[in-house]
Amino acid sequence: TELGASNIEIGRRMVSFTGDKEMMYKANFYLRTAIRILKPIKHFEAKNADEVYEAIKSIAWEEYLDTNKSFAVDAVVFSNEFRHSKFVAYKVKDAIVDYFREKNGERPSIRINNPDVALNIHIAEDKCTLSLDSSGESLHRRGYRQEAVEAPLNEVLAAGMILMTGWRGECDLIDPMCGSGTIPIEAALIARNIAPGVFRKEFAFEKWNDFDQELFDTIYNDDSQEREFTHKVYGYDNNPKANEIATHNVKAAGLSKEVILKIQPFQQFEQPKEKSIIITNPPYGERISTNDLLGLYQMIGERLKHAFAGNDAWILSYREECFDQIGLKPSVKVPLFNGALECEFRKYQLFDGKYKEFRTENKDRDFKPRREDTRPRRNSERVEYGERRERRNFDDKREGRGDFKNRDRKDRGNEERKEFKPRFKREEKSVSYTHLRAHETDS
């Protein structure tokens, strides 16, 4: 709602909402937990492939495509009538190609990677929705990641976990097993309220016929929502290579001032001097081999009990036997999917003295997820939505992000700034937009 959306409805692995074109741009740019934003262009019913073909062919495709552009179709199918999603995608492609061939004898090309127009068809039994994908590459690919360790945490999941805790930068945040630094980086972005889309080189809607460059420039270059962060985010790992990778990623995000990294095993974790929160994703033993996985979780429990008193710790894992080794009673259990793994995100309140006394003193700290525009959701969002920015570049040596206004396209390989040459300004057009769907993480 803070972004201006209306008619918000939470569904299964998706959220629908309505708004104008500006709302669509903002949804892509600001939402931390969305995987993609889809704009539905046709709803219909079909019981077989021929009916899908005819429905797609009836669309006035010159409004969205021309023969000089490429397109691709992604199909998501949950239906007894349609068992093969690839076959559905082929029928949609055939309908579009035949539409143009019959119109002018020419056809647009099909390109799987980075097409000019990306389409999505969703079928649930006989209910079909064809949408324009306004995001393109998955929104979890922020653009700051230079390298990754084995089995890195998805950026969208990391952001969702942080938002679930209610933390917004009120105290120090610690990830004692940070790997390539995803949780620390996402935490610093949340604390500073920096839009996750600021690192992206491109969104799919920038190739649309009605793309409003001036409008998107205004959205991109508006940093008025950013805020100061008076605490720190700490990321520790016992692997020197992981620390090196995390350092590169933090620097690429321009967050070296906010994020402090250190090579340190969890066994050496000591009681913080200031109020802190731990959010971490230890190894599960699924894709990462751990010689003594249960011993690792037992050690985690011991360090929390003896070196984190008076604070809260949130841990993501999927093995019950691992959680058992922690030896602490969780106050909150949140089911999450980390890829295909059914995990749980558990909160542990560490305290000194008697538990009853602690509960009395901390009544106001009971888990109450915040409801706001960046709240964690399942797997989608929908908007009904009305310029081109100079891509933002971060100089890691400066004091803060408020030191400049004009931002250039981010060079992923270094911190240099590239000259941005804006396109010609488009004339204002009156266009009617319908719903958008934003797919979000399985969490």
Functional labels for PLM-detected ranges:
Residues 1-115:
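Non-catalytic nucleic-acid substrate-recognition regions in nucleic-acid-modifying enzymes
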Residues 76, 101, 122-164:
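Class I S-adenosyl-L-methionine
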Residues 138-140, 350-371:
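Flexible, glycine-/basic-rich loop-and-beta segments that form/coincide
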Residues 153-270, 286, 294:
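Conserved S-adenosyl-L-methionine
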Residues 242, 286-354:
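Conserved Class I SAM-dependent methyltransferase catalytic core
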Residues 270-277:
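A short acidic, Gly/Pro-enriched loop at the edge of an enzyme's catalytic core
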Residues 365-433:
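Charge-dense, low-complexity intrinsically disordered regions enriched in Arg/Lys interleaved with Asp/Glu
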Residues 434-441:
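Conserved small/polar residues in nucleotide/adenosyl-binding loops
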